[in-house]
Amino acid sequence: MFNLNEELKGEIRHINNTLLDKYKELLSMDKNLLRKFIDPHIGKIKKLARMSPEELKKYAQLGGIVGVDGSKNRLGGAYPHFIEIYQGLAKSTLQADKPVFKAKIYTPLQMEENPNILEDSKEEKIRSDKNLADIEVEAALAAIREFDPYAVIMDGSIIRYDIASAERWMELKTECEEKGIILVGVTKDIKTSIIGEELKKEKNISIGHEFRDRELLYGTLEYGEAIFINIKTKKELAGLESAFLRSSDSPTVIAVDILESQKEYLEEMVRLVLTLTPKNGRGVPLWIDIVDSEVKISDSMIRSLLESYLDRRLLEMLFISERDKRTI
């Protein structure tokens, strides 16, 4: 057991009490009342069945499924003395021995002019998000051109590609639509507030805060139940259709996005996600978990790569702190 000081214990107790006070209405809310609200105001709650082996066979006959994910890691200290590696991976269920990797390396020191020492952290995040989104979209594009799959499942909401990598995203979207390839996004960490926004308008349900969908739907759906959203949302305005799904024994839900032009396949894709997700797992399709594990860039990997291919003098002068030298 860790030896915690009393001040730290007190801070944790304070946070606990603060959060209990904030979420007391939600924790005591009648889930049946919330379900009755969701059906007419948000979308139909529907119980779905996992696909049979016979149903799954059709995906092998029609090109299989491609899973896409990305990863990033960095070595170094404060701006501009750091280096980042981005890696994207697209992997076909039919040709697992032919992974499609894409990679990008970035450091502010590579710029021709002296980098801005006071670089805004918000701008850095925008750049980082774009680099990661670009590399994932590039991997997806390469995979659909090589494998011609039935569907592509991206790890995360596909709206983020429209935001962070608009030009490449439009290329991927257009190519999928032209080739009839279904494009899907699966999100574990839901950040939307679709239900919360509608609840605040409802006079018959007293709720003091605008809770997020992740919070409101915790324990609300049964395993295999999905909510097919039929109200206007930011995702719909971006040309997407969405559903919430409880895909495992865990009481949390995930979100499934699809292009609006392919909305007739939404229920099929939600069922596919349900089928590919272990009932006792973390809620996302096993194939995405496999891709996630293979694309990850560990601390030891980035250090090994830089030690092998970067001049040792540059590595130590630019990217290794005195503290880090103890582990290099």
Task: Tell where the protein language model's regions lie, with residue ranges.
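Two-metal-ion RNase H-like nuclease active-site motif
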Residues: 63-73
